[in-house]
Amino acid sequence: MANFKHPETIGLHGGEYRSDPATTAVAVPIYQTSSYQFKNAETAANLFGLKEFGNIYTRIMNPTNDVLEKRVAALEGGLAAVAVGSGQAASAFCIQNVCQAGDNIVSSTDLYGGTVNLFKNTLSMQGIEVRFADPKDPKNFEKLTDEKTRAYYGESCPNPYLRVFPIKEVADIGRKHGIPLIIDNTSSPVICKPLAHG
């Protein structure tokens, strides 16, 4: 895989995609399909059993999305990424993967309004408590932490406040307690790379 340095180049050419093997076109094709043909029943069984990597169904994986995910991971400096339909879907996806009913997260008070609605209404209906900490003092996250805390949450540059979230400080507190920090990086990896800060 090429090691590009500039975000513009990574955005256009990052990930592993170089050209279409059949046509040699350098633009990523848009695959408008929901399903894929399997070589045989054994291959299908291996794919569905997650013993083999490959396309099963577009909702799970699509070659176009695969390129997008690899480029986003490269831009963020991460190992992998998952493309979802919206920022709200990404936030919900992250939290629902670490929490179950009875668990809680500690979130920054500086949040986009839609996220506040997700946290106060949707997650509470699923039995997930959201505790709100003022990020001006990162220790506020630790004060609200207990044995059922599964994640800390913040926005790198929250809308509409634009007060930069103390990523490193909250990540350090999280590491001390074995709690992951989830960052909504809507501001983009061109402006901020949360993984570089903890």
Regions found by a protein language model. Give the residues of each.
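Short, basic and Ser/Thr-rich N-terminal targeting/leader segments
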Residues: 25-26, 77, 126
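Conserved PLP-enzyme active-site core in the AAT-like
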Residues: 2, 11-13, 18-19, 81-198
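Conserved N-terminal alpha-helix of the aminotransferase class I/II PLP-enzyme fold
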Residues: 40-92, 114-121
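N-terminal "arm"/small-domain region of PLP-dependent enzymes with the aminotransferase-like
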Residues: 2-62, 70-71
